[in-house]
């Protein structure tokens, strides 16, 4: 039976990405359901930030030395609290230890591989500054992708969804896996 996949490998890839998506949902939802509460939105977003490292390729210039850590930066108000630290603690990306940094200025922002920007009124300015530097920019402003951001979180039917600006990724020399693009809305 052919379900529209060109190859068996493509079908396996799709199942793998949906498997990860389901694991994220179960990971954050099951404890909450046992307490008759919903999983905090930012716990889900923290899991996404971690998993982006598995579906994105960065340019070689993203790291100064072979020993640099993989940095997930939070610029501006930190909505994640302990969730992002717990999610990243002890993990690796691209064979490098992952670290979370609360970024306070653009000089520190350019050291990040993933940069979550939560600075109302300053987002466009920050995006212009980090453009083309091999940084995966992530935000939740409704206009994030139109301002040049790469991945935007948004909610639809109480679910966290993704919108991806492929052109902005290309301009930053970031390659986003087709597996991630399949579960996202592509900004045009």
Across the structure, where does each feature detected by a protein language model lie?
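Short hydrophobic alpha-helices and adjacent helix-cap/hinge residues
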Residues: 2-19, 34-188
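Bacterial N-terminal signal peptides
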Residues: 18-32
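Short intrinsically disordered, low-complexity coil segments enriched in acidic
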Residues: 1-2, 29
């Amino acid at each position: 039976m052919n379900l529209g996949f060109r190859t068996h490998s493509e079908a396996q890839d799709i199942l793998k990405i949906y498997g990860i998506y389901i694991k994220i949902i179960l990971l954050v939802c099951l404890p909450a359901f046992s307490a008759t509460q919903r999983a905090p939105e930012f716990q889900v977003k923290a899991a996404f930030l971690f998993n982006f490292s598995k579906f994105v390729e960065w340019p070689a210039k993203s790291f100064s030395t072979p020993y640099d850590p993989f940095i997930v930066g939070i610029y501006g108000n930190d909505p994640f609290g302990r969730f992002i630290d717990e999610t990243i603690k002890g993990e690796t990306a691209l064979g490098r230890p992952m670290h979370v940094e609360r970024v306070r200025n653009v000089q520190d922002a350019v050291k990040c591989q993933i940069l979550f920007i939560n600075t109302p009124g300053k987002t466009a300015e920050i995006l212009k500054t980090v453009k083309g530097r091999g940084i995966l920019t992530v935000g939740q402003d409704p206009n994030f992708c139109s301002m040049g951001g790469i991945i935007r979180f948004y909610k639809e039917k109480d679910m966290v969804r993704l919108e991806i600006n492929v052109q902005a990724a290309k301009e930053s020399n970031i390659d986003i896996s087709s597996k991630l693009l399949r579960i996202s809305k592509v900004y045009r």
